[in-house]
A protein has these predicted regions:
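Asp-based, Mg2+/Mn2+-dependent phosphohydrolase catalytic module
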Residues: 10, 14-62, 179, 193-196, ...
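Hydrophobic alpha-helical core bundles mediating ligand binding, dimerization, or RNAP-core interactions
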Residues: 79-90, 105-113, 130, 150-161, ...
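Active-site neighborhood of HAD-like aspartate-dependent phosphohydrolases
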Residues: 48-104
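Compositionally biased, low-complexity segments
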Residues: 1-2, 29
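Serine residues within intrinsically disordered or low-complexity segments
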Residues: 3-6, 33
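Short helix-capping segments at alpha-helix termini
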Residues: 91-97, 139, 209-214, 242
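A metal-dependent, Asp-based hydrolase signature
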Residues: 100, 107-158
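Short, acidic loop-to-helix structural element flanking the phosphoryl-transfer center
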Residues: 123-124, 158-189
Length: 309
């Protein structure tokens, strides 16, 4: 049979036709062989047979994490650099002490990433961040002049901050993996943790050579109401894309953030360290690109296992 990834949209149909052809030949062989006193055992159903029989739901999209998945980066160094620069700007604008401003901003960012708000709070992460900065630091980030200052920093200053310490560059295998997904006719999106403004995320995309990748959706502070691993984050983005959880494969390196919590039906291909039990497939980004057929097969096998359990 041809490449699974190249015919993913018709995968089940192709497999059905192939199996029907082979089963017909085996039945004919069995009937003929009986005249010569020997028999051919009819094959047991394979995992892929079960996929078809169970009416498997077809994979439609692959969504990627960015940092340490598609982008090799010293993320802690980047966060520290960004945090110090933003704190310095807030200190100058608000005419407050640097230490106090850094402490307040740090608390806000911890609360944002930990999703410390009520379940009925539907503000975007950007709205939450802006309102908390105003409440705790006394600075209105939504003021046009102040907003423009931070936007300018993200787009015109931050791109030059990549140095030997941050060392951001494309992850080996990242572009080949994206090409494999595209060749398979699958939809593709960037599900990076939306704890940064759009400009800061696009900056890192530029460092990894991802700016021109035709992602259908890129998540950021302004279009998400929760951060990873909250299942709400994943489900609201899939709703925007018109997809259901069982139609999507997440690819990420973080054993906590890249697995929705609570589980919501999204499978994860894991490209980080360790061996999380929930992973559908494990390997490097280079492995993912080279063995994408195996990744797709693992997706369907996992789907069948869930159905049969």
């Amino acid at each position: 049979m041809g490449s699974i990834s190249s015919v993913n949209c018709d995968f089940l149909l192709v497999w059905r036709l192939f199996r029907n052809l082979m089963n017909t030949r085996l039945r004919n062989l069995t009937i003929t062989s009986q005249a010569f006193g020997f028999a051919v055992k009819y094959p047991e159903p394979t995992t892929l047979d079960q996929i078809y029989e169970k009416g498997a739901r077809v994979l439609k999209a692959v969504v990627f994490d960015m940092d340490e998945t598609l982008l090799s980066i010293n993320l802690n160094a980047f966060i520290l650099r960004y945090f110090k620069d933003v704190s310095s700007m807030l200190t100058d604008i608000g005419r407050r002490s640097r230490g106090g401003t850094m402490a307040r901003l740090g608390t806000i960012l911890v609360d944002l990433n930990a999703n410390r708000r009520s379940g009925t709070d539907n503000r975007t992460n950007l709205e939450f961040y802006q309102e908390e900065v105003e409440r705790r630091c006394g600075i209105c980030l939504s003021d046009p002049l102040i907003y423009e200052a931070f936007t300018y920093y993200d787009r015109e200053v931050l791109p030059y901050k990549n140095d030997d310490v941050i060392n951001a560059k494309a992850m080996p295998g990242a572009h080949a993996a994206l090409q494999a997904v595209q060749n398979a006719g699958l939809r593709c999106a960037l599900f990076t943790n939306p704890s940064f403004p759009q400009g800061a995320i696009e900056c890192r995309m530029g460092w990894g050579g991802l700016a021109d990748v035709p992602f259908e959706l890129v998540t950021h502070m302004g279009n998400a109401t929760r951060c990873k691993p909250d299942a709400t984050y994943y489900l609201e983005q899939l709703q925007v894309m018109g997809l259901k959880p069982h139609e999507v494969l997440m690819v990420g390196n973080d054993p906590k953030r890249d697995f929705p919590s609570p589980a919501c039906g999204i499978q994860t291909a894991y490209v980080g360290q360790g061996k999380p039990g929930r992973a559908t497939w494990r390997g490097t980004m280079e492995d993912f690109a080279r063995d994408f057929n195996a990744v797709i097969e693992a997706f369907y096998e996992h789907q069948v296992a869930d159905e049969l359990s």
